Amino acid sequence: VQTCALPIFYHRSYWSPRVTGFLRRFDHCNIALLIAGTYTPLAIALLEDPRALLIIIWSCAAGLIAFRLLWMGAPRWLYTPLYIVMGCIAVAYLPVFWPVSSAATVALSVGGIAYIAGAVVYALKRPAIAPLHFGFHEVFHSCTVIGFVCHWSAIVVAMSA
């Protein structure tokens, strides 16, 4: 809930610079938590022994959280690919996921593509469809909603497989 509610809370109000800085840090750290939190039920449901993947992904999450807490001013071109790399670790596991649940694997893949498209939009700051009302940031969040729905669907399907 927090990973979805915080961006709305953060973006829908005007805050003091101090509060904005805190919310921005929290928002960026939540991305790593969302990625690792998505991997966790999928790994448990689809892998015979999920320990290696869970250690890798939660270590990545801890590292990314520390990185964003310590260097919030890092350039967009540096930190955005780190989230993409963390998300793409799943590619190595797709052949193992497929025989257990092809539907979950497809939903996971489509969601990953949506998230990557959103990350590219965020990194490039374009396209801005209607700059005053629906800019690149709204396109980015639209992609993340699509990715979230696909990944939630993958988790539901995998947990019932």
Where are these regions (language model features)?
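Multi-pass alpha-helical transmembrane bundles in non-GPCR membrane proteins
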Residues: 3-161
